[in-house]
Amino acid sequence: MSKGCQTQGPLSELEKAIDVIIDVFHQYSRREGDKDTLTRKELKLLIEKQLANYLKHVKNQVSIDQIFKDLDNNKDQQLSFGEVMLLIIRVTVATHEHLHFCEDHQQQHQHQHQHQHNH
C-alpha cells in the first residue's frame, strides 16, 4: 500500500483477511499476461497451492477448465479480481456449511453417547 492509501488505525481481523485475499490474488495474477487478472494456468496454481484442502476434488485439468469457464463472466479468457472472488465466496459458503454440518454431527454423536451412558 502506498502512504496515501494506508488505514488510520490497526486493522480488524476481517480487514486483515481481506488484505490477505488481495495479496494472494496478486501473488498469482502477476506471473504471466495481464498483471491484474488470472490466466487458466495461474488459476490452477492458485487452487493447487492456496485451496488444496478446501478443493481436494479439483485435481484434473477438466475441473480447472470448468471452474475457469464458470467464473469467466465476460468470456475474455482471463479472470478479474471480481471474478475470482466468486470462487472465494463459493468456497467460503461451502466451508461454512460444512463446518456447521460437522458441528451438528458431533453434537448428535455426543448426545447419543450421553443417552447410552445414562441407562
From Swiss-Prot:
Keywords: Calcium, Metal-binding, Repeat
InterPro entries found in the cross-reference section: EF-hand-dom_pair (IPR011992), EF_Hand_1_Ca_BS (IPR018247), EF_hand_dom (IPR002048), S100/CaBP7/8-like_CS (IPR001751), S100_Ca-bd_sub (IPR013787)
Tissue specificity field: Expressed in v-myb-transformed myelomonocytic cells.
Domain EF-hand: 23-58, 59-94
GO cellular component annotations of the record: cytoplasm
One BP annotation, GO: endothelial cell migration
Annotated SUPFAM superfamilies: EF-hand
Binding site for Ca(2+) 1: 37, 42
CDD domains the record matches: calgranulins
SMART domains xrefs: S_100 (SM01394)
Binding site for Ca(2+) 2: 72, 74, 76, 78, 83
Gene Ontology molecular function terms on file: calcium ion binding; calcium-dependent protein binding
Superkingdom to which the source organism belongs: Eukaryota
Protein name as catalogued: Protein MRP-126
High-level lineage: Eukaryota, Metazoa, Chordata, Craniata, Vertebrata
